[in-house]
């Protein structure tokens, strides 16, 4: 008996998912990746705001950071989720590997005891790569799981809690940090006052773990498409050459030009152009479409952190942590003492000799 084919047989196959439940899983992975980027963005905003409060010359930048636009934040989250959902797993893996190689090269080129601003710049420009890494990691860890959608929903719930907590922290700090830190009665604000300079180190360790897992997942996702070792060699050889040339070019550009939004846009265009030319020879046409979505996602992330990029351009910002000697000297010059400390007793004046 004649029967019409199903609707899915007429639809083209899309990268990294099939129609049906796989589309829902890809949407969940993209949303989790976007929420992870939102958490990083909120923590960076807290760090930069506290640094602006501690620097009296940065009042205009502080007012710019404290301006909250919830609708724009939700729009940014929705757009990033869309781009991370549409990008294929193959291109997402390539984006993660390219950024990891560039980050390792940058960190190795820094001198010992320096490079705090360079690390902050890496935190700013890694946002789309972090979203791709989280999506790749989830795709690799949940591959073949019997309850994949349920596991992703649980991961989404955890990501939502973390994102809401980070956003609440940002609103609290931007509105009440100056009052609470001066009157010393809020534990959160006092904790940031004491440990603000340790936030970059904490973020660095967290991102190192995240990208280490993402790199392993990216290599596994790329290698599973090859049927033989010769195909893998034909893909990895030009990829290694392309990435090496890109890293050398990025290092030269970094030393010759200062960090700016325009420079980062040019860097994104060069990176995506290199990947586009590479995938024209060893990739598929759907990979080329994913490169376009990746380009839009990178530009979308840069548009959301314009204020933070402008702060990184300021010479001497963020201020370095004061040393113990400087703090003691400042305390001695101000003449301030703790009211709970016992004050040294002043010697009594000597009695004058009374003539007999």
Swiss-Prot record:
Keyword Phosphoprotein: no
Intracellular or extracellular location(s): Membrane
Major site of localization recorded for this protein: membrane
Membrane spanning stretches: 31-51, 77-97, 120-140, 144-164, 202-222, 232-250, 263-283, 285-305
Coiled coil: none
Cellular component per GO, a single term: membrane
Recorded topology in the membrane: Multi-pass membrane protein
Chain positions covered by the region annotation Disordered: 331-356
Annotated keywords: Membrane, Transmembrane, Transmembrane helix
Pfam families registered for this protein in UniProt: TMEM82
UniProt-listed InterPro entries: TMEM82
Record bears the keyword Transmembrane: yes
Family to which the UniProt record says this protein belongs: Belongs to the TMEM82 family.
Record's protein name: Transmembrane protein 82
């Amino acid at each position: 008996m004649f029967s019409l084919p199903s609707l899915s047989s007429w639809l083209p196959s899309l990268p990294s998912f099939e129609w049906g439940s796989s589309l829902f899983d890809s949407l969940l992975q993209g949303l989790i990746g976007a929420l992870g980027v939102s958490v990083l963005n909120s923590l960076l905003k807290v760090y930069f705001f506290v640094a602006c409060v501690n620097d009296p010359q940065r009042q205009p930048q502080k007012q710019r950071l404290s301006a909250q636009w919830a609708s724009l934040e939700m729009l940014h989250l929705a757009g990033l989720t869309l781009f991370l959902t549409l990008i294929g797993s193959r291109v997402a893996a390539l984006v993660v590997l390219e950024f990891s190689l560039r980050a390792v090269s940058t960190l190795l080129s820094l001198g010992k005891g320096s490079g705090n601003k360079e690390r902050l710049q890496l935190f700013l420009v890694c946002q789309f790569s972090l979203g791709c890494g989280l999506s790749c990691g989830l795709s690799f860890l949940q591959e073949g799981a019997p309850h994949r959608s349920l596991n992703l929903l649980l991961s989404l719930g955890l990501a939502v809690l973390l994102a809401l907590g980070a956003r609440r922290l940002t609103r609290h700090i931007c509105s009440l940090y100056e009052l609470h830190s001066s009157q010393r009665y809020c534990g959160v604000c006092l904790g940031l006052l004491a440990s603000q300079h340790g936030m970059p180190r904490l973020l660095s360790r967290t991102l190192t773990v995240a990208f280490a897992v993402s790199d392993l997942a990216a290599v596994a996702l790329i290698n599973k498409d090859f049927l033989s070792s010769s195909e893998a060699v034909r893909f990895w050889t030009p990829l290694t050459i392309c990435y090496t040339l890109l890293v050398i070019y990025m290092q030269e550009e970094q030393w010759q030009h200062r960090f700016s939004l325009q420079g980062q846009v040019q860097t994104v265009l060069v990176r995506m152009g290199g990947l586009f030319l590479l995938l024209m020879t060893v990739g598929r046409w759907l990979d080329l479409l994913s490169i376009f979505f990746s380009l839009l996602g990178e530009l979308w992330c840069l548009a959301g952190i314009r204020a933070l990029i402008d702060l990184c351009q300021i010479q001497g910002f963020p201020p370095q942590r004061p040393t113990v000697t400087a703090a003691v000297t400042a305390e001695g010059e101000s003449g301030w003492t703790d009211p709970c400390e016992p004050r040294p007793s002043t010697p009594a004046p000597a009695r004058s000799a009374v003539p007999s």
